[in-house]
């Protein structure tokens, strides 16, 4: 049977907010020679319900004007989408006629909520407070009340886009600007989604944006259908709807279950699932050149798993819930073989001191742990994916000398009980509450492994001598260099005679200061650095942000000076 493709076309206009980003280009459209049905959805700006009418064009094309309570049916459909979707690996919102990706560090922050399938999730971004409503498929700015359409692509590559963009964004602009929606000049953006509803292959997305400069508003809500089902228009429409529903149901029964992100830690993972977890949580690191996953499967590993499960039963009996989670621990290549035999307690190699205390430090997201990985001679980094019994989690208060629980009611510590990113397993628990299960070895491509470099700059921070902005045309004005300013006499000398510091990668500076500032501040710095890499902020703005977050210019100067000496 010839596969049928359904093409959905949605409409919207440009609202003038946010930054633009090009559509992803890694989806392959279907061959144009295959038969397909085309549904074009355009919502009238001044009508909430429509009358049903059927008419036939001279060219034989069937046109059906659909009558339905569009909002209610859309909500039911969105709820169906939300229940069937896997864990989102990309979340997008619609602004300025473009689909813009939510940054990866934000996805890391809300990862637990995404896995829990929460219908609404709050988050902060660039100093503003937003809410994601997956049920109604919009993003809400909690300060201005502006709503923008929401879409996502789950871990299996399934795409979930709203039916229509028109009324929601127009209402948002009307709310802010006080403009009449009927008179608002809009640009039509058509989003074509092609789905193979018969074949068993994964659906492929073809994003084709068409801009209509005329700005004419459509006066009716139409579903235009071209089908090979024959002259029976109503039957064609019902058949197409059923096929779409069956296709969505088919996703839920097969692929979505297999690829739905992070499974509960009580369940077993395979290598493919671990790779998916890593790809979801470490995308911000850059392009991964190679990725290998090794699972501990020896008899000793099985015995350790048995002991771990017994400890989980004990914790569950006393606490009501063992609270088992997956956690990522950075590791050195030299200790990996010993970890297979003795766990993370081998030789104290994993016991570290940080602002939270002394113990085994782990993270809920590979992005945070990967930044602390050592790089071997081949440029490869290693992490251990562990199951961890967290039990009752103690909120850590920043006492870097703490090495055991603050009370009998606690088992291990976290940075935030509500949404933990950083786990601290105390020394007394590291052999009983941690089960190392996989080793993930990865290598980043050279530009990302080295990181972007700060440019040498001219204007100085008066108290620190840390250069911030360099003269135009100076030979040191290269991307990504950090330099320590010279003496006052050097300031007045020509740029050609000014001494230059060696190149210093950003990640090297971040690693050096990470143990000297609060973890939440370090996360803010990394988030700002990601915005710099995405060219959402200028270098000068990032330098100011870095200085404000650290709050101690002497610390930056001494750290940079020490790193320069080590670089020789």
From Swiss-Prot:
Region (Disordered): 1-32, 220-241, 453-500
Inducing stimuli: By salt stress.
Domain RST: 497-568
Subcellular location: Nucleus matrix
Domain PARP catalytic: 245-463
Job description of the protein: Probable inactive ADP-ribosyltransferase that functions with RCD1 to regulate oxidative stress, hormonal and developmental responses. May regulate some stress-responsive genes. Seems to play a smaller developmental role than R.
UniProt name for this protein: Probable inactive poly [ADP-ribose] polymerase SRO1
Phylogenetic lineage: Eukaryota, Viridiplantae, Streptophyta, Embryophyta, Tracheophyta
GN (gene name): SRO1
